[in-house]
Amino acid sequence: MKSYPHKIDFYLLIPFFNNLPGLLHSLRSVQYDADKYTVVIVDDGSSEPLTLHDVYKGISRNISVEIIQLPCNKGITTALNTGLQWIEKQGNAHFIARLDCGDSCSPDRFTRQVAFLQENPSVNLVGSWCIFRDHTTNVAYRYITPTMHKKIKRSMHFRNIFIHPTVMWRFDAMKDGDLYPDTFPDAEDYGFFYQLLKKGEGAIIPEYLVTCEINHKGISLSSRKKQLQSRIKVVKEYGRNRVLRYLGVFKLRLLLIIPYNIVFIIKKSLYGV
């Protein structure tokens, strides 16, 4: 295992499972000073274990990459927590960012987010607006959210304001050992972001800094019912406003009975690119 004695701006945490083309696509979109960040890839039991040779076939060798191998497929929550625990042991970064295989960043994403957190010490967690795109049909829609902390806190009762691959948060916000909760299957990020917001403010940069791949085999589609049930549990546990909590749970239960293709059509008609 490498050691990273010098201070860096951020670690970029990416879970990986049998998707080398998607991983390389994502890594090629990252633009930042190579000396100031490290990519941490957690291979969640791929059929062919990921190697540094695989990664460096597609990106510059100047970029620092750490691959953590899990012996078998443990699921995204375990993969993410394994990565976070490794990062915590290093103790040499100001921030942690996320990206998923297949998603891509605007050239200034990380420069903007690092600067934002440096300039706003009360903010623990920053995300951005994003575009969801189906690369097979080229259908796309915008994901637009409130940007200021007070409205974010209210809106979190109804949906996860922070799209996972868009976020960056302070390393120091996890000093109590916070990890992704394993009690909310397919919505671990929702619970994790609520934990971070208990310790500081959240913010959204109102620009499309990430394009997220719509994966019709992914969690959000194939396990939608389980995800919605987990989101209900998150709102019940973390929501602090009784009225908003009730309304948020009502909305999520309504989504349980609406077919996803109807939801997708509505999103496309309202927010289509």
Would you name each region that the model predicts?
Residues 108-141:
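Conserved donor NDP-sugar-binding/catalytic core segment of glycosyltransferases
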Residues 146-226, 230:
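Conserved nucleotide-sugar donor-binding catalytic segment
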Residues 1-29:
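N-proximal low-complexity "stem/linker" segments adjacent to membrane-targeting elements
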Residues 9-11, 38, 191:
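Cell-envelope/extracellular polymer assembly enzymes that use nucleotide-activated donors
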Residues 70-90:
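Glycine-rich, basic loop-to-helix element that forms the pyrophosphate-binding segment
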Residues 43-54, 72, 100:
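A conserved acidic beta->alpha catalytic loop
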Residues 92-104:
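Short beta-strand-to-loop acidic/aromatic patch adjacent to the donor-nucleotide binding site
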Residues 28-37:
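Short, acidic, metal-binding catalytic loop of nucleotide-sugar glycosyltransferases
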